[in-house]
């Protein structure tokens, strides 16, 4: 317990009692100020209630003085205790007085008829003060009236009557039985610590966070997809990825750029009977064949081969120059031809039909590759292969060099043995994910995603298509939880899954840092409208971008507020003042208020419902999650080098596992 909290817990009650005892017996002194018998009687009677009223007044003043403090609940408990003692003393004094006159009271009358009204008034005021102190002790700073303007509803709401979704309605929309965790069922802006910034290492700033029921999405409405926007350091992993990975019961694919989620949740999911696979380039021996799903479940191999080529080359949503577009398109056609040669020509063994083999064929010297293409054209058993190769047979050397350079550049990451092993291995099959009992964590750090986004695109695209090609013949739904998804660049299969994934058992939860990231990856301002139209829920938290804050403010809508206006005029003959009330338009939340929101607070939008303002389910605040989470590699406990200890949460400083 801190010293400030201890003082607020003790001092108000002591000062209240000191004031009560110091003003006891003041009735004689006050009566002396009277100039008539009636005045003396009135002042004397007021002096009897003065000790109780003085104690109560000091307690109330203390509560208002502590308004905004993190320890105001302690002050509320102290004033509550002081009010209780004041009521007890007033009652005891009156009981003693009535007991002394009980023998003189006629038998047909009750001794309570002679109770002192002034003392009863003083005790009643102390009781009211105690109830307010109890409210402060329970709600903290939220017990005091807000300074927001008065909102008008009904017929007078000429400018709109937008309002936040009620918590009871949110509980029905997002029941706890759902597997995707949205947040916590409480209003952060009405919590006792609303005026304080959230700090992970300061438990006093948590407020009701971690103790409130969860809001979870069960995929029962809309497309079942969700989008999360949270700024850098905005607790994206701790409030979305880890809690959902702990609670989701179906197939799970997680893009984990920090490589911290898998070690923290793998054991919990294995205990639940799940098969957990971690695709980590630093740990060899784990990989799958990214081409093993091609042509299965009634789909044509040619279409699937083209899809793989687009993931490696990446589509560009923005308009490029004609020259660049020609070389990129030709390089994609060359890559398509080489993949088709491996898969369709019939001269490559099934177990050797991998992207590693495609890269080996492509990385040959340019003259040798041209000779190979001519040989493929003359001897391939597939018409599709011949049609794609024919363009390059008689292409001029200069043009072919540009095409060749583009293709080699885009497949450069396949020359790394550890990266190629991830998409050319045999430790598991894409069918394992579609069968519903497998979870896959893609542990590619930001450096790898930045330098080789094609690797992540191929992995995620293969897993998505393996489910999509089954036409809904899968066990349960598979959740793709993609953190830092903007690093992947433009991925068309994600748009396909966005528009039709619900029917095929695919659910997407994508995490961006801002609207700008989405627009950069998916082609300008039109990207937001396409994605928002297809999302069941959209969450905004820890926003630092003014454009994003302005969008949130506009989407929340406008309210009608009543404004008091005072006009003063001064002239030669004097001055006058007039007061009036008028109705004005005000956004439900202003852009600067969005920027000032606590980082553990979020705004969630759903189609056809008011905006929801609620808390975030940060895992280290919840005892039920801490009990089943493994060690965080960025906050190691025990001995060793830990550069985060100084700012680590309390349980990490104590050396205990969360």
Swiss-Prot record:
Query: Region (Disordered): which ranges?
Result: 562-585, 637-658
* Coiled-coil ranges (or none): none
* InterPro entries per UniProt: P-loop_NTPase (IPR027417), T4SS-coupling_protein (IPR051539), Ti-typ_conjug_TS_TraG-like (IPR014135), TraG/VirD4 (IPR003688)
The protein's superkingdom reads Bacteria
The alphabetical list of record keywords is:
Cell membrane, Conjugation, Membrane, Plasmid, Transmembrane, Transmembrane helix
Compositional bias per record (Polar residues), positions renumbered to this chain: 562-573
Report the subcellular localization.
Cell membrane
The portions of this protein that span the membrane are 6-26, 46-66, 72-92, 118-138, 215-235, 275-295
Record flagged with keyword Membrane:
yes
> Per the record's keyword annotation, is Transmembrane included, yes or no?
yes
Pull one GO CC term from this UniProt entry: plasma membrane
A Pfam family: T4SS-DNA_transf
Q: How does it sit in the membrane?
A: Multi-pass membrane protein
Stated family: Belongs to the VirD4/TraG family.
**UniProt xrefs under NCBIfam families:** PRK13822.1, TraG-Ti
Q: What is this protein called?
A: Conjugal transfer protein TraG
């Amino acid at each position: 317990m801190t010293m400030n909290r201890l003082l607020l817990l003790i001092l108000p009650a002591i000062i209240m009692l000191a004031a009560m005892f110091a003003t006891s017996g003041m009735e004689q002194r006050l009566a002396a100020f009277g100039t008539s018998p009636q005045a003396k009687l009135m002042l004397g009677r007021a002096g009897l209630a003065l000790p109780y009223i003085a104690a109560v007044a000091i307690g109330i003043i203390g509560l208002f003085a502590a308004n905004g403090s993190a320890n105001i609940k302690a002050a509320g408990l102290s004033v509550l205790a002081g009010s209780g003692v004041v009521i007890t003393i007033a009652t005891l004094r009156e009981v003693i007085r009535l007991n002394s006159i009980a023998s003189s009271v006629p038998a047909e009358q009750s001794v309570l008829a002679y109770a002192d009204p002034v003392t009863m008034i003083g005790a009643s005021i102390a009781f009211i003060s105690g109830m307010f102190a109890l409210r402060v002790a329970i709600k903290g700073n939220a017990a005091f009236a807000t300074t927001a303007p008065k909102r008008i509803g009904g017929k007078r709401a000429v400018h709109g009557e937008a309002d936040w979704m009620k918590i009871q309605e949110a509980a029905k929309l997002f029941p706890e039985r759902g597997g995707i965790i949205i947040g916590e069922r409480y209003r952060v802006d009405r919590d006792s610590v609303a005026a304080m910034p959230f700090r992970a290492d300061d438990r006093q700033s948590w407020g009701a966070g971690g103790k409130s029921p969860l809001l979870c999405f069960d995929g029962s409405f809309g497309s079942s997809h969700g989008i999360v926007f949270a700024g850098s350091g905005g607790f994206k992993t701790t409030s979305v990825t880890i809690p959902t990975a702990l609670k989701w019961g179906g197939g799970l694919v997680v893009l984990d750029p920090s490589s911290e989620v898998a070690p923290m949740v793998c054991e919990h999911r294995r205990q639940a009977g799940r098969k957990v696979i971690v695709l980590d380039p630093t740990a060899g021996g784990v990989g799958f064949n990214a081409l093993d799903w091609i042509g299965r479940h009634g789909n044509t191999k040619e279409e699937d081969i083209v899809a793989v080529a687009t993931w490696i080359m990446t589509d560009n949503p923005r308009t490029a120059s004609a020259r660049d577009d020609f070389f990129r398109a030709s390089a994609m056609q060359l890559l398509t031809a080489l993949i088709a040669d491996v898969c369709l020509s019939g001269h490559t063994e099934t177990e050797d039909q991998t992207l590693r083999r495609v890269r080996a064929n492509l990385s040959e010297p340019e003259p040798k590759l041209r000779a190979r293409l001519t040989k493929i054209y003359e001897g391939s058993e597939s018409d599709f292969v011949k049609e794609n190769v024919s363009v390059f047979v008689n292409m001029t050397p200069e043009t072919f060099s540009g095409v060749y350079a583009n293709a080699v550049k885009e497949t450069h990451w396949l020359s790394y043995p550890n990266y190629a092993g991830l998409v050319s291995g045999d430790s598991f099959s894409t069918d394992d994910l579609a069968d519903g009992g497998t979870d896959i964590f893609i542990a590619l750090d930001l450096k790898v995603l930045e330098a080789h986004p094609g690797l992540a695109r191929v992995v995620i695209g293969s897993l998505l298509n393996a489910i999509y090609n089954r036409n809904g013949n899968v066990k349960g739904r598979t959740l793709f939880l993609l953190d830092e998804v903007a690093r992947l660049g433009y991925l068309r299969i994600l748009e396909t899954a966005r528009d039709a994934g619900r029917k095929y058992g695919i659910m997407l939860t994508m995490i961006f840092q801002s609207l700008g990231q989405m627009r950069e990856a998916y082609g300008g301002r039109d990207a937001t409208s396409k994605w928002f139209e297809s999302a069941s829920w959209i969450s905004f938290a820890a926003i630092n971008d003014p454009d994003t804050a302005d969008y949130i403010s506009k989407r929340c809508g406008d309210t009608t507020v009543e404004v008091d206006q005072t006009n003063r005029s001064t002239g030669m003959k004097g001055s006058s003042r007039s007061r009036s009330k008028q109705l004005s338009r005000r956004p439900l939340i202003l852009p600067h208020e969005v920027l000032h929101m606590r980082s553990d607070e979020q705004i969630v939008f759903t189609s056809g419902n008011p905006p929801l303002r609620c808390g975030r389910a940060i895992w280290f605040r919840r005892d039920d999650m801490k009990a089943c989470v493994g060690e965080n590699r960025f906050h190691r406990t025990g001995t060793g080098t830990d550069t985060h200890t100084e700012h680590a949460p309390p349980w990490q400083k104590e050396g205990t596992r969360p």
